[in-house]
Amino acid sequence: MVKNNRYLVLELAQHAINAVRGDRLVAQAASDAHFEPPLHVVAIGKAAAAMAAGVQRVLHKQIRRTLIITKRGHNSPWSKALRQAEIIQAGHPIPTRESLAAGERLLQWMEDAEQDARFLFLISGGASSLVEAPV
């Protein structure tokens, strides 16, 4: 009986984790979306790579460029799906010099876009530490 209860709890936990995966949620939300090109995707946060992979899966024909800013080590499971993306790893939970560099790069990246560019921002937890741009 105890083993069955343990198995049930583990199965429920795995189901809950799968239900909130960033790639799945973003792919589902974006599946009916259409953006006029050129579309530029910016994903920031600890789930940035997962979210970018999800939107890439359903909007790949519309996406011109993707910039991902995430916590160091949080992009590796998604690296294969995001070969074309620019990935920046920065400081979390405390901002670092990398966070300042990420902020500078984000501003430059946006300035480099076409006049008629559309931007899709995907933001998850950790973004306020990962990207800093002092005024």
In which residue ranges do the predicted regions lie?
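Non-transmembrane, aqueous-exposed alpha-helical and coiled segments at domain scale
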Residues: M1-V135
